[in-house]
Regions:
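Solvent-exposed serine/threonine-rich low-complexity stretches and specific carbohydrate-binding patches
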Residues: 305-317
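Membrane-anchoring hydrophobic segments
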Residues: 1-133
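Aromatic sugar-binding surface patches on proteins
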Residues: 272-274, 315-325
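Membrane-embedded alpha-helical segments of integral membrane proteins
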Residues: 139-192
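Short acidic/polar inter-strand loop motif in beta-rich domains
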Residues: 331, 341-354, 358
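Low-complexity, Pro/Ser/Thr- and charge-rich linker/hinge segments at domain boundaries
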Residues: 357-371
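Internal/C-terminal transmembrane anchor helices
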Residues: 195-226
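Membrane-interface segments at or immediately adjacent to transmembrane helices
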Residues: 216-285
Length: 371
């Protein structure tokens, strides 16, 4: 045993970690993020559920072990030799669980849906890099843990209950709040060093404040309806259902490139139908009502005006997303957008386009694809 321990203490990995201790936590955070980005696909797959549940469980255990290490709890046990790796494990699981948002919403047509998460992620990275105590700062540690826990439960509970609504969101928030406070109370009770470093009332206030802010964002419709995601949104000249597929005919334009503005031109002829086709990812057997809100920009008032709300139901489970379309006739020229919304009016995505008069001299470049 002593020989094994001596080899461990002189190992190349241990030496590497000690030499680069300043940057190791941030590397492990990004490593967890990249690992899940490359391996996760569908939130309702057994593999994805297992990985995310293991990440959350391992993160909770790592936090417990790490916070009790300062009290010498693991001295003369096999855990003592691994104590210096616990912060790295915490960073890895933080990164891995954070990546769930990006993975399950990266396919969305509306890039703004994930922008808020990227901002939060950047703030986490900056705070993690520049705070003097980094992950040893327990206020930061439990604040981030609660945010990660909240997002974890907002993914998992709808998948297991096969339902998504405001009540489910509130249940998810309550589950994350209770689990975080239970873990905090256990660590606070068993760790004298933790009781010295933090004020329990302040820590609980921070967690409840995060809970309140997330709920405020939800009711202000600033949080996407996880785990639903908009796969595709197309303004089309024709949509035909044939042999279980949808044949969608639309104008082929470079504007479909994701880094450019999603404002397409629709060359319109009088009395022509304007179609909006959308495919939405939803976990297996999750049922949800979706509707398209057609809005027209009023150039005189400088405001968007709602013209029509047209709905349809979805049942999840299809890899390519559950498909549906709506259409309108006798539309006016100008700027339009169609919001893809849940019945709680949470935005899955926005499809923007401009209706222009069709020139007979200029042929249309139409493309038909199957979905």
């Amino acid at each position: 045993m002593k020989r094994t321990l001596a080899r461990y203490q002189k190992s190349a990995f241990r030496s590497f970690i000690r030499r680069h201790s300043k940057y190791a936590p941030i590397v492990f955070f990004i490593g967890g993020f990249i690992f899940d980005t490359l391996t996760l696909g569908r939130i309702d797959r057994t593999y994805d559920l297992t990985v995310l549940c293991l990440h959350m469980t391992s993160l909770s255990i790592s936090l417990y072990l790490y916070n009790l290490a300062d009290d010498g709890t693991w001295k003369n046990t096999f855990l003592e030799r691994y104590e210096e790796y616990l912060p790295l494990a915490i960073q890895f699981f933080f990164g891995g669980l954070s990546s769930a948002y990006v993975i399950y919403f990266s396919r969305s047509v509306s890039l703004s849906k994930t922008a808020s998460f990227f901002i939060i992620l950047v703030l986490l990275l900056i705070a993690n890099e520049f705070l003097k105590k980094r992950i040893s700062n327990k206020y930061l540690q439990f604040g981030v843990y609660y945010f990660i826990s909240f997002t974890f439960f907002t993914f998992m509970i709808p998948v297991f209950l096969k339902e998504l609504n405001t009540t489910i969101f509130l249940i998810s928030g309550a589950a994350s709040l209770v689990s975080t406070l239970v873990l905090l109370s256990i660590i606070y009770t068993k760790s004298p060093s933790t009781r010295k470093e933090i004020k329990l009332a302040k820590m609980v206030f921070i967690i409840i404040a995060i809970y309140g802010i997330i709920n405020l964002f939800y009711f202000l419709k600033l949080i996407p309806p996880v785990p639903l995601a908009l796969d595709k949104g197309i303004v089309a000249h024709e949509v035909i259902q044939r042999n279980g597929n949808y044949e969608v005919t639309y104008e082929s334009e470079e504007s479909f490139i994701f880094w450019r503005k999603h404002k397409l031109d629709f060359n319109y002829s009088p009395n022509q139908r304007v179609y909006i086709f959308s495919s939405i990812f939803a976990p297996t057997d999750l049922k949800k009502s979706i509707f398209h809100r057609w809005r027209r920009y009023n150039s005189q008032t400088k405001e968007w005006e709602t013209v029509d709300d047209i709905g349809y139901d979805i049942t999840g489970g299809r890899d390519g997303g559950y498909r549906g379309y709506t259409y309108k006739t006798n539309v006016t020229l100008g700027e339009w957008e169609v919001q893809v919304l849940t019945e709680e009016e949470q935005v899955l995505g926005v499809i923007g386009f401009e209706i222009k008069p069709r020139s007979l001299q200029q042929p249309l470049h139409l493309k038909t694809s199957k979905h």
